Structures are given as structure tokens and as C-alpha cells.
Swiss-Prot record:
Belongs to the Mediator complex subunit 16 family. It holds the Pfam family Med16_C. GO terms for molecular function: RNA polymerase II-specific DNA-binding transcription factor binding. This is Mediator of RNA polymerase II transcription subunit 16. InterPro entries: Mediator_Med16 (IPR048338), Mediator_Med16_C (IPR048339), Mediator_Med16_N (IPR021665). The lineage of its organism: Eukaryota, Fungi, Dikarya, Ascomycota, Saccharomycotina. The keyword Coiled coil does not apply. Its main location: nucleus.
Length: 938
């Protein structure tokens, strides 16, 4: 197979770290770019969202809305590669699209002329048509589903263009990164700890004066550097030719990699003319003005040819070799690492492959050789210019099948070889050994592993793929969770999740859970969304559930516990540290993972505990944010009232409208406290009842106790503000304050007494647990996940029930509480999805990502997956089916209007003022951190 096909099959798809997937369409007559993403159907099953199709052509900068006929016909070409800016700590929101001619277009997800929006909308930032850059920012409209007269025609070509881009790289910023080395078991307490390094930026990275930058190399040997200064929207370009020799005018392939030198790229090319490899060093001087930060200067490029070598014709044992693949891998973030050069050969007459691994090293020529040339050795002995690069042969790797492509993965810590027989082999960059484990299914009990370097080292691997001839393109998902591929016979991609061959040995569950936790922490530190890893973990949970329900739940608890351990999160510290922990993105991601792993289990508490925790955290942030804004508006109003022509109404209205927007969340919290009290009534009357045990987990878990106390504290703070600063000029606006008081007054449970009850539990709980030596790292995952008290802590259960009976229930109207409605809680997984798709759509062994053909005919659209009668972020019952713009979360499936303008009929008064409510925080991301996308309402 020719390398041109190998490169196009690998780079024809790009999966962003935020979850968007871009791939080329080589057949359609009305578009060449597809954008899709994985979305949950029912909490456990997923599907690829119907792709939006776009036309990327060289004339995008022209007026797209013009209906006039252009002077010359417009054509679009096949796309050769696409690249999200996933490198390092970049945000993954920019997409570079390169067509076969060499035109390069940069698109931005979630950005438009009117500001930020949902990520499923694209805008063009700039386009390079080889000879000219067009810096016109414009929205990119998707191709209509029914358009009989496309304005742009597809133009196929069989030619190879000299301007084709062979390799492309995004350049990272100067933020330091965290490199995870391994999860190491601490034998004193049998807990895995995270071994990590805080690494400074390495390789090539741009300074703060540059907003974004990228680099590419073309077939004709030209290097292009695009960059955007932080004070402008326009992009600039610097071009540089490798050499003026004819051999660099027609390159067969090229690679760009970061080196161990600061601000230096290693460029490797293979000339189709000279039939040899050439290597260059490219140094980038960003030309930062250190004396005047406001003055920006263009970067400077310095290119140096360092080596030329020819490919091997014979193998180590005299085999005839044919050059087949070439890959240069960047150095890793860890100090002391170097770029690696991999040259792949087919062994002629066989199906086997040989990969020769090299490193570029500096060496001093032999002095005897120099003296034979008549050079003065004494003059050259201390001259550093004598140092020359050479390729040091390090290792030969042999494979029993032809290599389809080579991909560096896991932040370049792993190298993945996809073979023609459908299998994958992954090598660790630090050991260059196969990163896998030969699992013995007969080994029962006593299994242990002290070091986990990656999930593949614990026995997980990618499944066998379909025949290579049936695959159009294939790539590894960003967080290692599986393989995305496009079959030639199917219109949409397919996802193959990681799988584990050994399931019958329960002693391996801890190691397997820690392996998932290690990858979760690794990629969460690099701002990955991680839905692919969640699907792989959920697949493993279902396979365990077939063997034992208890093992499946224990596995989830082990995953959550391992994540907390690897993050170093302890809940026994001071209250201030606990508050910061609960506000962190890591805790938010942990709640989401538990929700995803806990859906469709027999133990409903796993999902409900995570959802309740996430909801309490969201309400706490909303209360805190509104209180701070209300306090600021009170100060604004005081200033405006002192002015002769001040507009006090707008500030007063905005303040009261913010308060009004909190009322649904207050109603939810009141219902939640009522629900917990109802469960306490049931348990006090029947202590052996396990169907109402969620309250035990809520009261035992320190995170939920603390969050409930924080919400009550914020409510008291809000009531204090509206009592101390009522509206005197526009008294009608006080209605929202009255509604808030009424929502609290309608609670059948006295919230002040409930607060006292929680504080007393906090005070007595620690002494009860400390008496039995239970550590938070052991007990918290059990409380957080299982919502149950272990048998060893049975005295804690007895205390909770007896104390609840005397301290709370004895002072409560039990009949009023017991018959109160709590229908608006929606804390169970099936309540978030339409009944037609709420159950599993196919057996888990067939995969959790389903085709559209599996879905019921009436539930093919995304708007039919979740009920459209409830806004899960604002906690408000509202018929959203009639609204023009609503959003859905790809992870938890909630539907919301967050981030959109508030309708006049949903404010305290009809007014032309458009307020910015607290829900505007969730214009792009859901409260669970999932991606929000706009629904096509029926």
C-alpha cells in the first residue's frame, strides 16, 4: 500500500479534545467536510449525531449570501487532512482543513459574529489559498439537507499538486504541563498514588503575544508558518523553502516533530527525486520585544540542513526491503526524551514488516578521519562547529503483518501500529516494549500489580477490526477509549471500545479500575472531554454486571476511589479546602463519570447519588453568583439614585430578575429535602428496608452534606439581602422577593431545623468513624457511589436513624411531609429520557454506540431522546418544544434554554431589557461539563 493512501486514511479524520469529530466526505456532490460528535441516547447507549455537512472551497471569503452567478464556476476538492488544535493545553476549538490542492482553512467552533455560541456551529477565521491569505471572519453555513441546485461543484483530480500540504502541526502555548508517569501502589496502605512531573513548556511554543500559531510543509519543500498576534484578528504567514535543489521540489512525504531543543522543530522529508531522506532543524525566534510589550514583531525562521540518508535495501538478515512508511515522533514532556524516527519496510515475498527505530544524535567526527583530510586536529578539537548529526540505530521491530499506519498517542507516550490483519500493537515510548499484558484466565486470586503505566498495561486492548480493504479511514480516540473508523459500506462512522479479555478473576478488578482512573486523570489534566473513555468503562461495567451485580457496583466505587486517590483528594481536611475541592472541575467530572457508569444498573442509587451531588453543586454556584451580583447591583442602584438623571429601573429590574430566576432551583432544593425526609420516615419505621436507602448515602457522604449546608447558607444570605434592601422606588418589583420567600415558606420541612440536623451529624459523624479507624479514602467512595453504609459501620446506620427520629422527625409534621409531591426532582436515570429509548437498545456485547437503524422510527431525531418539558439547568418546568433555540447535553441528555435570551413572558415584568441570568454560564457546557448543542426542534 502506498504511503499517500496511508497518510490520507490516518489524517482524514480528527477528533477534538472537546468532543467534535471532523472527517472528509470523498463521495458527496454537495459537500466535503462532515462534523459530528457522540451523543447519549439514554444514558448508556450512544450514537454519532447526524453529521452536518459543509463545503470547504477556495472562495469561502466571497459573499456566501450572494445569489448572483459568479464570473467563473466554483469548485471544491477532496480534503486531504484535518487537524483540531489538540496539542498540549490548547483548547481544541480550532480546526485546520487542508484540501488536496494545498488550500488551508482554519475554522473555529462555537464562535460567530455575535460572540460565543454552541460548539456545533462553525465560523471561518481565515483561509490561505496558497498565494494569498483572506482574513475575513464569517459564519460557515451547513449544506441544506434538500438542495437541488448546489452553488459549488465537486472537482475530482488524479494529479499530485506541488502545493499539497504533507504535514501540519499546531503550536502550543507557554503553559506548563503535567506529565503522568505511572500509578504506583503504596504498599503501606495498598492505595495507588500518582507519579507526575510538572513540566515546563517544551519544543516549540509561542509566547503570550501570539494568540495562535501553526506550521505546515508542502510537497514542493516550502514551510509555511501562520500566526495571529493577540491584539488582532488577522493571521500572517511566513514561508521558507527547504533548499533550492531540485530534489526538494517534489517530496513524497514529510514529517514535523518537536525536539529536545527549545523552539526547534525536526523536519524529516523523503524526496521522490533523490530517493533519500533529508533532515532539517527549524529554529523559530518569536522576536518578543522585552522592553515594550505593546510592540509586536514578526517571528524569524532559521533553517539548517543536518543530515541526508538513503533507505535500506536489505534487512538485518539479508531480506529484501521495500520502503512503506515514515514517522517522526515528537519528544515527550518528560525531560531527557528525544524525538524518534521510525522507518517502516515491507519484507518482500512475505506479509511481515520491519520497523527501524532511530534517534538523531550529535557526534564528533573521528579525529583520524579528519587528519586524513589534512585538517588541523588541534584547531578543531575544541570547535563545536565540528559536531555533526547522525542517525543512531536503536532498535528493530518486526511484525507478522503489514503496517497500515503509525500513530503516536497518549500525548506521544505511546506509539500505535495498526496492522493489516486488524490488530493493534502499542509500544511504550519509555521502554519500547509492547504495552500489553498476557492475561492468564486460569490465574484465580492473588493477582496484583504495583505499577500502572497505561491502561494497555493492565490487559486492555483494542478489538479486532474489520478487513483493511473495507475501512475508509481509522483513528484512535483522543482519550484512548476506543477506535473510530469509517467503513466504505456505511454512511456514518463506527466506534469500537476497549475490551478486557479476563473477567472471571475478581482480584483483577482493583487494577482494572485503577487503570481507567489513571487514564481519566491523565486526559482530564489535558482538558479532554473523555466520552470515549467513559464508553469503554461503561462497557466493562456491563460485562461485569452479567457476572455479578455486586462486582459491577464495587468496580465503579473502585474507579471513583482510585480517581480521588490519584488526584490526592482528601475530605478530612479543613472546610476551606473542602469548598475549593467541590468547586473544582475535577469533582464535576467525577460526578459526571459516576452518572454515566451508574445508569441502567439495578442499584439506582449509583446514578442518583452523582446526579444529586452535581445538582447541589450547580445550585450552590448559582446562589453564590446571584448573591454577589445582587450585592453589586444594590451598590449600583445607590450610585444611580444619587445622580440627577439616573436610570434606576434597569438595575432594580435586573437585580429582581436574577432573584426570580433562582426560584425554580429553590423549589428543587425544597423538594430534595422533603424527599430525604420521606425516606427517613420509611427507614425509621422499617430499618431493614433497602429500597429507600439513598438518604443514608446523602447523609453519610461528606460532599453532599457540605453542599446542602452551603445551599442553606446561601439562601439565608439571599433572604438577608432582600430584607435589608427592598425595592422602594419600584415596589412592584418586590414580587420576585415575595415569591422566593413563599417558595421557602412552602417547605414542609423547616430548613433551619434541617440545617441544625446536618451540623449535628457533621459533629458526631467524625467521632463515630474515627473510633473505628475508617479513613476517608476508604469510606467516601462507598458513600458516594453505593449510597450505603458498610456492615463494619453498622453503628453509624443505627445512629443516623435514631438521631433523625429524635432531632428531625419529632419536630416535623410527618403527614404533610409524607404526602408532599417531589415529582420535580428527576434524580433517577430513566426520568431524563423518552420511554421509547429509556431501556438498552441492544445487548451490551454488541457495543454501546448504536446505529440509527436500531432506534425506533419515531425516535430518530435528537429532540425525541429527552423530554422537552423541563429545563434541567434552571430546574424549571417549561414546554420547550415551541421554542426556536434549545440545547441538549451530549453527556447527561438534559435539555435547556441556558445562554439564550430570556423571553418576556418568563420575567417578573414584560420589558425590553434583556438580562444576563446566572444560567448564561452554561451557554456552551452543561452543568455536568458535557457539550451543549442546538436541537432541531420538530
Amino acid at each position: 500500500m502506498h504511503l499517500e493512501h496511508l497518510m490520507s486514511s490516518t489524517t482524514a479524520v480528527s477528533w477534538s479534545k472537546i468532543g467534535l469529530i471532523a472527517y472528509g466526505d470523498a463521495q458527496s456532490q454537495d459537500g466535503n467536510l462532515c462534523i459530528t460528535f457522540l451523543e447519549t441516547v439514554n444514558g448508556s447507549n450512544w450514537r454519532f449525531h447526524p453529521p452536518k455537512k459543509y463545503v470547504i472551497h477556495p472562495q469561502l471569503h466571497e459573499d456566501q449570501s450572494s445569489n448572483g452567478n459568479p464570473k467563473s464556476p466554483l469548485f471544491f476538492h477532496d480534503l486531504r487532512s484535518m487537524h483540531w488544535n489538540n496539542w498540549g493545553l490548547l483548547n481544541g476549538e480550532l480546526l485546520a482543513v487542508c484540501d488536496e490542492l494545498g488550500n488551508m482553512t482554519v475554522l473555529a467552533a462555537g464562535q460567530g459574529l455575535n460572540g460565543n455560541g454552541a460548539y456545533d456551529r462553525l465560523s471561518v477565521l481565515f483561509q490561505d489559498n496558497i498565494f494569498k491569505i483572506h482574513n475575513q471572519v464569517l459564519p460557515l453555513e451547513s449544506v441544506p439537507k434538500k438542495d437541488a441546485t448546489p452553488k459549488v461543484e465537486r472537482k475530482h483530480t488524479k494529479k499530485e499538486y506541488y502545493s499539497t500540504i504533507l504535514d501540519f502541526q499546531w503550536i502550543g502555548n507557554q503553559k506548563p504541563s503535567v506529565a503522568q508517569v505511572a500509578a504506583q501502589r503504596d504498599r503501606t496502605n495498598n492505595i495507588f498514588k500518582n507519579q507526575m512531573h510538572q513540566c515546563p513548556p517544551y519544543g516549540v511554543f509561542h509566547p503570550a503575544s501570539i494568540k495562535s500559531a501553526c506550521i505546515a510543509i508542502r510537497r514542493n519543500g516550502y514551510i509555511d508558518l501562520w500566526y495571529q498576534f493577540s491584539n488582532t484578528l488577522d493571521f500572517k504567514k511566513i514561508s521558507l523553502q527547504l533548499s533550492k535543489d531540485k530534489e526538494s521540489e517534489w517530496l513524497q512525504y514529510a514529517q514535523i516533530a518537536h525536539t529536545d531543543k527549545e523552539q526547534c522543530f525536526l523536519i524529516g522529508v523523503f524526496s521522490n527525486v533523490a530517493k533519500s531522506f533529508a533532515f532539517y532543524e527549524l529554529l523559530i525566534n518569536w522576536n518578543v520585544n522585552t522592553t515594550n510589550q505593546a510592540m509586536f514583531h514578526d517571528p524569524k525562521l532559521t533553517l539548517r540542513h543536518i543530515l541526508r540518508v538513503r533507505p535500506d535495501a536489505l534487512g538485518p538478515n539479508g531480506e529484501l526491503l521495500k520502503l512503506e512508511n515514515f514517522h517522526v515522533i515528537s519528544k515527550t514532556a518528560l525531560p531527557g526524551t528525544r524525538p524518534e524516527i521510525l522507518i517502516s519496510y515491507n519484507i518482500l515475498g512475505t506479509e511481515r514488516s520491519l520497523v527501524r527505530r532511530f534517534q538523531m544524535v550529535l557526534s564528533n567526527p573521528d579525529m583520524v578521519f579528519l587528519s586524513s583530510l589534512g585538517l588541523a586536529i588541534t584547531a578543531l578539537h575544541n570547535n563545536h562547529s565540528v559536531l555533526r548529526y547522525s542517525m543512531k540505530h536503536v532498535q528493530d521491530l518486526t511484525f507478522d503483518s503489514k503496517i497500515m499506519d503509525i500513530q503516536s498517542h497518549s500525548l506521544d507516550a505511546l506509539v500505535c501500529f495498526r496492522l493489516h490483519n486488524g490488530r493493534f500493537q502499542l509500544y511504550n515510548r519509555h521502554t519500547w516494549a509492547v504495552e500489553s499484558e498476557t492475561a492468564d484466565a486460569k490465574q484465580i486470586g492473588g493477582y496484583t500489580k504495583d505499577t500502572i503505566i497505561s491502561i494497555f498495561g493492565s490487559g486492555f486492548n483494542y478489538p479486532l477490526l474489520p478487513p483493511a480493504d473495507a475501512i475508509e479511514w481509522c483513528a484512535i480516540s483522543p482519550s484512548s477509549g476506543g477506535i473510530i473508523l469509517k467503513l466504505k459500506c456505511k454512511p456514518q462512522p463506527t466506534f469500537y471500545a476497549l475490551e478486557q479479555s479476563v473477567l472471571t478473576d475478581p482480584s483483577r478488578d482493583i487494577v482494572h479500575a485503577t487503570a481507567f482512573a489513571f487514564e481519566f486523570v491523565r486526559f482530564n489534566n489535558m482538558i479532554h472531554s473523555g466520552e470515549d473513555l467513559a464508553i469503554a468503562a461503561k462497557t466493562h461495567v456491563f460485562r461485569l454486571q452479567r457476572l455479578s451485580e455486586e462486582r459491577a457496583v464495587n468496580f465503579i466505587a473502585s474507579v471513583i476511589g482510585a480517581i480521588l486517590s490519584l488526584y490526592g483528594i482528601h475530605f478530612d481536611g479543613p472546610k476551606e479546602i473542602l469548598e475549593k475541592l467541590l468547586q473544582s472541575k475535577a469533582i464535576q467530572k467525577i460526578f459526571l463519570l459516576q452518572m454515566e457508569l451508574g445508569s441502567h444498573l439495578k442499584n439506582k442509587n449509583v446514578y442518583s447519588m452523582a446526579y444529586a451531588s452535581m445538582k447541589l453543586r450547580s445550585i450552590n454556584l448559582a446562589m453564590n453568583g446571584v448573591a454577589r451580583n445582587v450585592h453589586a447591583m444594590i451598590q449600583h442602584t445607590a450610585v444611580v439614585n444619587s445622580l440627577p438623571n439616573g436610570r434606576a429601573f434597569q438595575f432594580a429590574f435586573s437585580k429582581q430578575d436574577l432573584i426570580y430566576s433562582l426560584i425554580p432551583s429553590v423549589n428543587w432544593f425544597v423538594s430534595f429535602v422533603t424527599f430525604l425526609t420521606q425516606q427517613l420516615i420509611m427507614l425509621v419505621n422499617n430499618p431493614m428496608d433497602n429500597t429507600h436507602s439513598l438518604v443514608l448515602g446523602i447523609l453519610s457522604c461528606i460532599t453532599t452534606r457540605h453542599l446542602m449546608l452551603k445551599v442553606i447558607l446561601e439562601l439565608k444570605n439571599m433572604i438577608g439581602l432582600i430584607t435589608k434592601f427592598p425595592e422602594t422606588t419600584y415596589t412592584v418589583l418586590n414580587e420576585s422577593s415575595r415569591f422566593l420567600r413563599k417558595a421557602l415558606g412552602d417547605s414542609p420541612v423547616n430548613l433551619e431545623k434541617f440545617e441544625v440536623f446536618l451540623n449535628e451529624i457533621n459533629n458526631k459523624f467524625l467521632s463515630l468513624l474515627d473510633d473505628h479507624g475508617a479513613q476517608s479514602m476508604d469510606r467516601e467512595p462507598s458513600f458516594m457511589v453505593k449510597a450505603e453504609i458498610p456492615p463494619a459501620l453498622g453503628h453509624v446506620r443505627e445512629f443516623l436513624l435514631s438521631f433523625a427520629g429524635s432531632a428531625l422527625l419529632a419536630q416535623t409534621n410527618l403527614a404533610e411531609v409524607f404526602f408532599a409531591s417531589t415529582h420535580n426532582l428527576r434524580i433517577f436515570d430513566h426520568q431524563h429520557f423518552h420511554p421509547s429509548v429509556a431501556n438498552l437498545l441492544q445487548p451490551p456485547e454488541k457495543g454501546l454506540v448504536v446505529d440509527d437503524a436500531i432506534l425506533p422510527d419515531a425516535c430518530r431525531g435528537s429532540s425525541s431522546f429527552s423530554p422537552l418539558d423541563y429545563d434541567d439547568i434552571s430546574s424549571e418546568w417549561v414546554d420547550m418544544s415551541a421554542l426556536v433555540r434549545i440545547k441538549r447535553c451530549v453527556r447527561c441528555g438534559c435539555v435547556t434554554r441556558a445562554g439564550n435570551p430570556v423571553a418576556k413572558n418568563n420575567t417578573i415584568l414584560e420589558t425590553s431589557i434583556v438580562t444576563k441570568r446566572w444560567t448564561a454560564l452554561y451557554s456552551r457546557y452543561c452543568q455536568c461539563t458535557g457539550l451543549l448543542y442546538e436541537l432541531d426542534t420538530p
